[in-house]
Amino acid sequence: MKEGWHKASIMSSAHKGGAPVDFADGTSESGDIQVLGKQLWRILPYIKPYWKRFALGITSNMGARICDLLPFVAMGLLTDAVLSGEIGQLKEFAFYGLLILGSFTGLAIFQGISNYSWETLAQYLQHDIRMAAFESLIKMEIRYFEDRQTGDIMSVISADVNQLENFLSDASTSMIRIVITFSTAFAILVWMSWKLALILFVPIIFIMPLIYFFSTRVQKKYRESRQSFGDINAVLSNNISGMGVVQAYNAETYEATRVGKESSSYKDHAIGATVQRTKFLPGIYVIAGIAFGLLATAGGYLMLEGPSQGGITPGQFVTFLLMSTRMSMPLFILGMLVNQIQKSEASARRVFAMIDLEPSIIDREGAESLEEPANAITFDDVHFAYPNGNKVLNGVSFELNRNQSIGIVGPTGAGKSTIVKLLLRYYETDGGAISMNGSDINELTLGSIRDQIGYVSQDVYLFHGTIRENIAYADQNAGDAAIVEAAKLAGADEFIQEAPNGYDTIVGDRGVKLSGGQRQRISLARAILRRPPLLILDEATSAVDTRTEEIIQRNLNQFKDGRMTVAVAHRLSTIRDADQILVLVEGVVVENGAHDELIAQDGVYADLWAVQTGELDKTTGEATRHDG
């Protein structure tokens, strides 16, 4: 991994000790307006790996600015030479002409090198910053993503990072150009007349307070604007992903209104920033005009006095006027530049807030890797409640060993899928313990735990790409034979072979081109390909027909040899052959045993079985079976 991507290398010590920050608005808990560019300064450590390119950009920019100002000096010298009668022949004029031509040639060369250096540097930096943000994001626990809108997260990694790229390739080079131009021109003017040079401090005295005044007002507007942009992305993401539902319910007008509301909010915040900017720019023009007028007036007076009285020559006056026009341009640019800096500061605040994220579920100090394949799972009096306070598990206990399978059933909300999430350490228990091979999973590394598991979620997710790529996601090095074998075990090979391009058929975003049952079977094939010691099936075949499910179950019975299997199901036929079946009601294991044992107990499980097999009317509770 590249050095620039390491979070540790870019977290400022000041931030580490500060208040918590969320990229959603990028503000500290106090809500104070930060100093201009405070977040943008955090880009500097990312430049370190590319310091040679950075140095080349600086030096070439300096060369370009010197070449840009040199013709003004030449014109002043030429003016004095002509007025004093020192030159009068064409070849002497040609010298100054060639000097000016050489200056413009040098300007073209140096400026080209500078542009290339800065724009390529911007690309390297935006890549490293984007990767740092993403690498920080993917370490966050599942709860983090459940609490946030996908569109807003995406806007940080895409739009906000792109805004920083624009800053790096445009605004930052403009700032450097302003500094170099102003300092070089100032040095030349001091050399000619320190009295006139002092006049240059007049605009600086007034511009700096104006910049601070503007930044404190516009920064909040741009921060709100970036958040509104994230909200637009979130609504659009929901609409596009759920377009089938939108159209099925004739909700196009309703959704257009929702998008319009968020877009209008973004528009209002952007206009608010524009209003502040339009108040700021005229002040810059006025100050620059005053400075130019003072230079012209004072310069004319000193020229009339002449060098003998401490004044300047006509040529020096010409140079002063030309220089002052060149120096006034940076002041005009500065007005627009401060606006761009504020936009970039708002984006940087969101990007670095994401980079600063710290997951709550991590490898504990001294955590050990699970070296041997998992062969025993134990839940010992496990309690768990979600952050909203909803208590889901109340003292759940069970054991699962190699070559065994366990089925988990119960009404919706009983805590079945929560057991799966705890096994994957998406969450941590509030009480009790979960162990794997006799070790508390909290004392094992996350990676070694998840390496043991092949997981099929009830919310099947397929990536945009081919069927082959989606199955091979579990093992990037798997060959075609292994992929096909996994698909056969999952009952997917038959429909894949009938697809237009077989295993190279594109499934679409989230597998939208496939049926629910087809998506489930590809997800199951993905888990099988991993050949995990622990197979977790969370409603893995709920969308397939009964015949296909029977085929899959037969195949899985062979695959389960030497493994542990946890199956969550509403369809009891799925887990009928499990060695152990847990019946959960309101987070409590009310029944535990094999299928025949639970039927004999004539309890909750027996009632569920009777309803599903048609032996009990689920609406009246009356028996429907008939003797004889």
Regions found by a protein language model. Give the residues of each.
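Short cytosolic helices in intracellular loops of multi-pass membrane proteins
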Residues: 9, 15-19, 124-143, 149-158, ...
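ABC-type nucleotide-binding domain
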Residues: 356, 363-364, 370-628
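An intracellular "coupling" helix at the cytosolic face of ABC transporter transmembrane type-1 domains
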Residues: 44, 142-143, 159-168, 172, ...
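Helix-loop-helix
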Residues: 86-95, 188-202, 272-349, 354-355
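Juxtamembrane loop-to-helix connectors within ABC transporter transmembrane domains
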Residues: 29-30, 39, 47, 114, ...
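Transmembrane helix-loop-helix hairpins at lipid-water interfaces of multipass membrane proteins
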Residues: 54-110, 117, 190-195, 297, ...
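Alpha-helical segments in transporter systems
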Residues: 41, 52-73, 77, 96, ...
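Transmembrane helices of ABC transporter permease
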Residues: 53-63, 173-224, 295-312, 329
